[in-house]
Amino acid sequence: MISSNDFRTGTTIELDGAVWRVIEFLHVKPGKGSAFVRTKLKAVVSGNVVEKTFRAGEMVPQALLEKSKLQHTYMDGDDFVFMDMTSYEETRLTAKQIGESRKYLKEGMEVNVVSWNEKPLEVELPNSVVLEIKETDPGVKGDTASGGTKPAILETGAQVMVPLFISIGEKIRVDTRNDSYLGRETQ
C-alpha cells in the first residue's frame, strides 16, 4: 500500500484490477475542507488516460511490477519474441504492448520486460541505442559550418534528425527517450 501523499511521476498503482502509472500529480490544499491529490493516470496495458482525485493520505494498493532482462530474438508475424538468456524461456509481446519502443528495437538487443502477475506488460529500452543509418541525403563538403540538421532513417525504420555531415552506413547513438542524435559511434 502507498499513501496518496507519496505519489510521484512514474509510481504504479492498482485500481479496479488494472495497473495504472501516475503521469501527473498535484497536491491541493483548499482554504476550506480537507486536502486532496489530483492525479492523471495512464493504464499500462491499454494506454488510456484518466483523471482521478484521492483524499490526502488515502492508502492505495501499489502495483508490484517485476523487471526481467530479456533478449529480442525474432518477429513472429506481429508478435515480438523475447528469450530469457538463463532459462531459455520465450516470452511474446504484441505490437500494441511494445508501442513506440518498436522503432528502436532490433534483433539481439537486450531490454527490460516489465511484468505484473507474471503477465508481460511493456518493454523498457536502454536510454541510448546504437543504430546504422540506412537512408539520408548525402553530405556535402563544408556542411559542418552551418550547423544544420537533416532527417535520417535508421535500420529499424525510425526517423531521427542528424547533423549534415552524417552519411549512409554510419553508426550513430540515439537517445530513445526523446528521439535525439547523441553522436557517432566509433568501433
From Swiss-Prot:
Gene3D superfamilies xref list: 2.30.30.30, Nucleic acid-binding proteins
UniProt xrefs under SMART domains: EFP, Elong-fact-P_C
Domain of life: Bacteria
Location (main, coarse): cytoplasm
Cellular component terms (Gene Ontology): cytoplasm
Pathway given in the UniProt record: Protein biosynthesis; polypeptide chain elongation
Molecular functions (GO terms): translation elongation factor activity
Keyword terms of this UniProt record: Cytoplasm, Elongation factor, Protein biosynthesis
InterPro entries from the UniProt entry: Elong-fact-P_C, NA-bd_OB-fold, Rib_uL2_dom2, Transl_elong_fac_P/YeiP, Transl_elong_KOW-like, Transl_elong_P/YeiP_cen, Transl_elong_P/YeiP_CS, Transl_elongation_fac_P
Family statement: Belongs to the elongation factor P family.
Job of this protein: Involved in peptide bond synthesis. Stimulates efficient translation and peptide-bond synthesis on native or reconstituted 70S ribosomes in vitro. Probably functions indirectly by altering the affinity of the ribosome for aminoacyl-tRNA, thus increasing their reactivity as acceptors for peptidyl transferase.
UniProt protein name: Elongation factor P
Species this protein is from: Prochlorococcus marinus (strain NATL2A)
